[in-house]
């Protein structure tokens, strides 16, 4: 894969907002309804009215055998230059979730499956010398304190084929967090 261009963060992420925020949901009931036929929406931008908190829950410390097998597959980004299966990354022993409300006050708690929160945790655990509590507090500081006070958050929600087809009451998880800086009121005039 070759990047053809880059969308910068100038002017409060204006170009990124134009690219990512053309059809933003604010109502979970409407989004879930649109996930069914005929629209079959499986990826959406969602702006919560309020993010209540970041939930950190303990998870398995080792990969399940079926996940481990998938992780060891050849890397599709090496253009055939790989010498064999890739080494699996270390499993993060925690699940990170946001609890938020939509425009009608409907509360949802969804897993954050974004690679960025995993990379943040790995960097924090390394800087904390392996201290998981310190690493979690640093993740919480970024995703709860900094993001919720200084950023204009939009969540990218996606479904898995399994959850989409089985018609879960809510088939979505958070697959990305879009966090441009919150604009001051002066910037609007």
Regions found by a protein language model. Give the residues of each.
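Nucleic-acid-binding small beta-barrel platforms of the OB/S1 family
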Residues: 4-189
């Amino acid at each position: 894969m070759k990047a053809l261009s880059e969308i910068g963060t100038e002017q409060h992420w204006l170009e990124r907002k134009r690219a990512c925020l053309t059809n933003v949901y604010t109502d979970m009931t409407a989004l879930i309804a649109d996930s069914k036929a005929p629209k079959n929406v499986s990826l959406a931008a969602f702006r919560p009215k309020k993010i209540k908190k970041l939930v950190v829950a303990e998870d398995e410390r080792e990969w399940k055998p079926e996940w481990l097998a998938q992780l060891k597959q050849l890397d599709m980004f090496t253009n055939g230059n790989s010498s064999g299966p890739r080494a699996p990354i270390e499993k993060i022993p925690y699940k990170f979730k946001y609890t938020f409300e939509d425009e009608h006050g409907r509360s949802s708690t969804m897993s954050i499956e974004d690679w960025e929160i995993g990379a943040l945790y790995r960097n924090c655990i390394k800087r904390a010398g392996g201290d998981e509590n310190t690493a979690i507090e640093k993740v919480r500081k970024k995703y709860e304190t900094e993001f919720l006070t200084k950023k204009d958050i939009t969540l990218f929600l996606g479904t898995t084929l399994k959850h989409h087809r089985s018609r879960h009451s809510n088939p979505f998880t958070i697959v990305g967090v879009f966090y441009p800086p919150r604009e001051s009121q002066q910037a609007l005039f």
